[in-house]
């Protein structure tokens, strides 16, 4: 038996059809190659992201893998928006809520209708009042304070004060000008407490008492 023909292997080159060669050449010619380092920098090393599903593409007899980077960009943008620090809200100063019937409009109505808010009982509101007398009026319906050289009975205004009664009590029986200017420098006290005017501070006696 002749076995020489079984071991004789002959290889011959088989050329693809001309049409397939032309298509393959045109498809390969349209592929653009870019620098790998620049691609990694621009895409944030997206090729290392295993979560992106690869796609198999075939051009003629040439097959290769394509990775979609658009989803990775969306995820990075969404994550950056998620971790943005929220802007701080400005801190506002809270006011003490007034009781019904004690708004500033209610106070304005009262000053127009009440005959004697200062409690003068017929006395003049232009008389000179020493500081010693101011200190004696600290309770009840007669609470005096000095504002910009004038003496006022602020007892009727207590419940109308936007800052509360406790804050206004700090000025009772003393000169409250500094405290008033600290919080209400823009307020015209001559108009606000016009009907509460008791008199004018006698600053001559105050100066004599100073060392």
Swiss-Prot record:
Q: Where does the record place the Cytochrome b5 heme-binding domain?
A: 126-202
Q: What are this entry's molecular-function GO terms?
A: heme binding; metal ion binding
Keyword Metal-binding attributed: yes
- The keyword Heme is annotated on this UniProt entry: yes
Matches recorded under SUPFAM superfamilies = Cytochrome b5-like heme/steroid binding domain
Q: What InterPro entries does the database record attribute to this sequence? A: Cyt_B5-like_heme/steroid-bd, Cyt_B5-like_heme/steroid_sf, Cyt_B5_heme-BS, Cytochrome_b5/Flavoprotein_Rdt
Region listing for Disordered, in residue ranges? 1-23, 42-90
What are the Basic and acidic residues biased-composition ranges? 1-10, 47-58
User: Which UniProt keywords are present, listed alphabetically?
Assistant: Cytoplasm, Growth regulation, Heme, Iron, Metal-binding
Q: Where in the cell is it found?
A: Cytoplasm, Cytosol
Q: Which GO terms describe its biological process?
A: lateral root formation
Bias (Low complexity) ranges: 69-80
Q: In which tissues is it expressed?
A: Widely expressed.
| Chain sites annotated for binding heme | 161, 184
Gene Ontology cellular-component terms listed: cytosol
Q: What does this protein do?
A: Involved in the control of lateral root (LR) formation. Acts a positive regulator of early cell divisions involved in LR initiation, independently of ARF7 and ARF19-mediated auxin signaling.
The text of the family note is:
Belongs to the cytochrome b5 family.
Q: What is this protein called?
A: Cytochrome b5 domain-containing protein RLF
Query: Can you name the source organism?
Result: Arabidopsis thaliana
């Amino acid at each position: 038996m002749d076995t020489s023909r079984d071991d004789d292997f002959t290889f011959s080159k088989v050329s693809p059809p001309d049409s397939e060669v032309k298509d393959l050449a045109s498809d390969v010619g349209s592929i653009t190659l870019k620098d790998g380092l620049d691609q990694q920098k621009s895409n944030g090393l997206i090729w290392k992201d295993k979560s992106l599903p690869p796609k198999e593409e075939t051009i003629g007899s040439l097959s290769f893998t394509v990775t979609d980077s658009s989803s990775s960009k969306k995820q990075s943008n969404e994550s950056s928006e998620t971790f943005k620090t929220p802007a701080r809200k400005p801190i506002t100063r809270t006011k003490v809520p007034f009781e019904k019937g004690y708004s500033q409009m209610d106070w304005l109505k009262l000053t127009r209708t009440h005959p004697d808010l200062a409690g003068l009982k017929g006395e003049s509101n232009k008389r000179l009042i020493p500081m010693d007398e101011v200190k004696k009026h600290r309770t009840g319906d007669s609470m005096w304070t000095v504002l910009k050289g004038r003496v006022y009975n602020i007892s009727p205004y207590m419940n109308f004060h936007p800052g509360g009664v406790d804050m206004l009590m700090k000025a009772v029986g003393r000169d409250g000008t500094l405290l008033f200017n600290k919080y209400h420098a823009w307020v015209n006290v001559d108009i606000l407490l016009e009907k509460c005017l008791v008199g004018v501070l006698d600053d001559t006696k105050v100066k004599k008492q100073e060392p």
